């Protein structure tokens, strides 16, 4: 049975060292989390699986690691400086601040009906309601108060301010002088670093269309109301691909990447019934998108976006390129007066220059971790009436691949053998192997069930040739316990390597 609530997952993550509140000893920093010993392993395993699939296993992909600090002009011409904002509203009574669309989603149906009527918007179209409210903020604030919009913190109707936009980018300054010339930003997405490096990568690799550039990295958004644990946070990590194609082939490649990403998430252990493709209607599309399909996941807190696959057309390269007019670029935020490079592709057959279209699969690493934990969390009743919690993670993603456990910790022959075996298994390169000498084998099994360790290897008296029957026939054999079935088998240590490699290698 899965986790019944997000609180249950949060408690497990803290108790077992997956994820902690950042700066907790000083009251915590809202919307910021630290990954603990097991969390960092799970997160890295997910990222490595993504990189292996999309970079190493493909012949049409290159990698990139662009800087977090971003030149102001990059985000000026991308449109972020002017438009990367969320609608915000305050309750004068509680002094609480909320993102408007999130606040409205939590309202009772009768409250929303009154608000739709007050703003003269067709019922059921929340996107249109938010747009209407932002176009008439004074009227909207009064309508919210009159309609009895509830404050989630108090559960009572609020006295609401007119909504306004809040830019979510974190500003900083490069160098010792904090003036306009030194202004820079912490990147709000990893994508822009790929776009401005398009020509660099193209020149360095001599790639031909279609090809992609992949990147994993941190991004920062000053979210108005971070919530739902690591789902919506202010510092997060993205796994993004910008896949460059010829105009006219974009719709094919968009469909291709939607199917490819759905397939990959299932291979990582997410069930198909919990993955819901959602094609955004025209009124929900971002200003740069021709089409977007979101892969939604049934998180403990509800159905929410795990990954988005957008057809961004020529908007991005067209916004950052020089010679926009000569290249026939119309889908741009501003006339670019600063770019020094032509971000275009020369057709090797016709010699004609054009700006490629871009398909962007963009996934949240933190959301992926949360989805994997939610999917894997299982509570089972055992035949003896006891209950166990087990994380049924895909073995290759598990933070600890193998636990090597001496049956007793007061026999040097057994503990030293276990340590040597741990080193031998670690040399296989399959991931983290943990030596643990707690002295209570039953508790060790339960602990490793709870953190998702797929195999526990026990070194005992038989292993060192001191069987109870006085024989040495089981010398150099160990007990291997399976996490999911709890079944135990006896293997010679020389067989153990092949056994584990077969089950843990990608």
Swiss-Prot record:
Keyword hit for DNA-binding: no
Gene3D superfamilies cross-referenced by the UniProt entry: 3.30.40.230, Anticodon-binding domain, Bira Bifunctional Protein, Domain 2
Compartment list: Cytoplasm
Binding positions for ATP per the UniProt entry: 221-223, 231-236, 305-306, 364-367
GO CC entries: cytoplasm
Coiled coil regions in record: none
KW Ligase (keyword) present: yes
PROSITE patterns, sorted: AA_TRNA_LIGASE_II
GO MF entry, a single one: protein dimerization activity
EC top class named in words: ligase
Keywords tagged on the record: Aminoacyl-tRNA synthetase, ATP-binding, Cytoplasm, Ligase, Nucleotide-binding, Protein biosynthesis
BP-aspect Gene Ontology terms: glycyl-tRNA aminoacylation
Assigned EC number: 6.1.1.14
Function (record text): Catalyzes the attachment of glycine to tRNA(Gly).
Assembly and binders: Homodimer.
Protein family (similarity comment): Belongs to the class-II aminoacyl-tRNA synthetase family.
Name of this protein: Glycine--tRNA ligase
Organism in which the protein naturally occurs: Thermus thermophilus (strain ATCC BAA-163 / DSM 7039 / HB27)
């Amino acid at each position: 049975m899965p986790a019944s609530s997000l609180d249950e997952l949060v408690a497990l993550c803290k108790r077992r060292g997956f994820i902690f509140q950042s700066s907790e000893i000083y009251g915590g920093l809202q919307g910021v989390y630290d990954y603990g010993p097991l969390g960092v392993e799970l997160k890295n395993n997910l990222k490595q699986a993504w990189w292996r699939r999309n970079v190493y296993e493909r012949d049409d992909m290159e990698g990139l690691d662009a800087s977090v600090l971003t030149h102001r002009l990059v985000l000026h011409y991308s449109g972020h400086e002017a438009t990367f904002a969320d609608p915000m509203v305050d309750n004068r009574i509680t002094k609480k601040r909320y993102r408007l669309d999130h606040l409205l989603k939590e309202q009772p149906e009768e409250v929303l009906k009154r608000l739709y009527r007050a703003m003269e918007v067709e019922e059921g179209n929340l996107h249109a309601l938010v747009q209407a409210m932002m176009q008439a903020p004074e009227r909207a604030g009064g309508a919210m108060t009159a309609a009895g919009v509830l404050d989630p913190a108090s559960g009572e109707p609020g006295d609401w301010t007119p909504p306004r936009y809040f830019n979510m980018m974190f500003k900083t300054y490069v160098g010792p002088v904090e003036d306009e010339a030194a202004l820079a930003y912490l990147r709000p997405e990893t994508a822009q670093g790929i776009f401005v490096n398009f020509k660099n990568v193209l020149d360095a690799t001599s790639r031909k269309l279609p090809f992609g550039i992949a990147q994993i990295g941190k991004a920062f958004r000053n979210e108005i109301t971070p919530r739902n644990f690591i789902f919506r946070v202010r510092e997060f990590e993205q796994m993004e691909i910008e896949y460059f194609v010829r105009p006219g082939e974009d719709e094919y490649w968009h469909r291709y990447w939607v199917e490819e990403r759905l397939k990959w998430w299932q291979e990582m252990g997410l069930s198909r019934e919990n993955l819901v493709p959602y094609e955004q209607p025209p009124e929900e599309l971002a200003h740069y998108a021709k089409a977007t399909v979101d892969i939604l996941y049934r998180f403990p807190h509800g159905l929410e976006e795990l990954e988005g696959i957008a057809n961004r057309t020529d908007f991005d390269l067209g916004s950052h390129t020089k010679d926009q007019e000569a290249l026939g670029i119309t889908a741009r935020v501003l006339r670019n007066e600063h770019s020094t490079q032509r971000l275009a592709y020369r057709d090797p057959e016709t010699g004609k220059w054009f700006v490629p279209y871009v398909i962007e699969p963009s996934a949240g690493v933190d959301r992926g971790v949360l989805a994997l934990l939610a999917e894997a969390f299982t509570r089972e009743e055992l035949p003896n009436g006891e209950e166990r919690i087990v994380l049924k993670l895909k073995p290759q993603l598990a933070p600890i691949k193998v636990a090597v456990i001496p049956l007793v910790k007061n026999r040097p022959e057994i503990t030293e053998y276990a340590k040597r075996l741990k080193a031998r298994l670690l040399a296989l390169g399959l991931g983290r192997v943990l030596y643990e000498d707690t002295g209570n084998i039953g508790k060790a099994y339960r602990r490793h069930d709870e953190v998702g360790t797929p195999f526990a290897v026990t070194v005992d008296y038989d292993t060192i040739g001191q069987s109870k029957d006085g024989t040495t026939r089981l010398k150099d054999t160990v007990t291997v316990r399976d996490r999911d079935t709890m079944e135990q088998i006896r293997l010679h240590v020389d067989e153990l390597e092949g056994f584990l490699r077969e089950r843990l290698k990608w």
